[in-house]
Amino acid sequence: MFQVQKELAGHEVVIVALFEEEKMSSFVQELDKAFEGQLQVLLEEKELSTKKKAISKVHSLGKTNVKRYYFVGLGKKESYTTETLRAALGKAFKTLQVAKVQDAAILLDSFVTEKLDAIDVAHIAAEVQGLGTYELQTYKSDKKDREELEKFTAITAEDAQEIEAALTVGYVHGRATNSARTLVNMPPNVLTATKLAEYAVELAEKYDMDYKVLEKEEMEDLGMGALLAVNQGSVEPPKMIALIYKGKEEWTDVIGFVGKGITYDTGGYSLKPREGMVGMKGDMGGAAAVLGAMEIIGELRPEQNVIAVIPSTDNVVSGTAFKPDDVITSMSGKTIEVLNTDAEGRLALADGITYAKKLGANYLVDVATLTGGVIVALGNYTTGAMTNNEELFEQVLEASMETDEPIWQLPIFDRDKERVRNSKFADLNNSPGREGHAVMAGTFLGEFAEDTPWVHLDIAGTSETKGAHDLGPAGATGAMVRTLATLVERFGEE
């Protein structure tokens, strides 16, 4: 699909950057010569817009060997960022998709500034081409054929091999994020814990990873009472899924991802209202993020060791379901008083974290649609984070900045730990109250990470969006897929 060329050569469409500067860039000046000065006129008449995310279409009318040019407004160079570029290109690729364009090129060097080099632009362009044109996988009987871009060419004077490599990495990041989106959007009668495990196994086999899928009896033998308690009310069997990627000769410095895999959450006996229950098919967004990251890792083969653990079940009501006031024993041996059956994700993750440590994880990052509290605190654009290790958190933060997936650190104080340890009947309680809800959930998980360096990512607000946006339609976003993968790719770098 991707090609790299030094010059334009008969493309259907070429994408060109337009900055809000007094002078046209050298690339636009060269084009303007072919247009006999008419581009300058269009700029002066505001027919070509330099505003951020503005898309202006110009027909060549035979003046060049390209049929149409799409000029992408990027605003002022001084405020130009990777986020600006992602948003603008996302809109551009959507426009091409609507126009059913099959052969497009990007004048890569026109997007390059002191802040962003050609490799950065190539990576983002290929990534966004996939993200921006993603379409919901529906179950409608009258499915329409998807329009795909068949050929995409980067026009640049830079080294073709390096640019092609950046295009490939960007494409892999975008495609894997879309894989996660599709998982999150799947209905709960289709994506059960069993089906999620089957998907994970197929992924592992495709990329020659080791894997384990623990069944209920094996979980009982290992004492995974927290996950098993959540599963008590279900007719669907639980699964503890583990994918193991060995990127080094020695099994050291193992990064452990733990993704919440609750395939549907009614709240259990602490029953959600109807408004709160609709959409809970997406409560396995953390599992999807982890699997998306493992897809990228499988494709790119970084020299790191990585474990992905997914505790999976649904949380439903029945005569056998666990109840408020129950006391359960986790795999770690710590006992937990259940005060809220709708705080089930942290119970599943508790055993997932302990199991990841048992498999050899030296560093832990858990990802979960964990609390409504994080949405109240940070909104729908920023992922909440907590940690017991600032050095590991800084690496996660840098990865999130590179991928434009913002995170914000929330605190863990000793008084927070006291609140999750204040049960009269057990070592911990799973729901100390609504105050500081997001912090309480993360603090609870920290009790199981213990001294292992750990970062918690609460994607309850960022995993899905209600409306279409520059990088895709309403629905699942694939939050944290690219951040997790980038963390692995950059892990340990100074």
Swiss-Prot record:
It is found in: Cytoplasm. One of its GO terms (biological process) is proteolysis. Its EC number is 3.4.11.1, 3.4.11.10. SUPFAM superfamilies: Macro domain-like (SSF52949), Zn-dependent exopeptidases (SSF53187). NCBIfam families: PRK00913.1-2, PRK00913.1-4, PRK00913.3-5. HAMAP family: Cytosol_peptidase_M17. This is Probable cytosol aminopeptidase. The lineage of its organism: Bacteria, Bacillati, Bacillota, Bacilli, Bacillales. The gene is pepA.
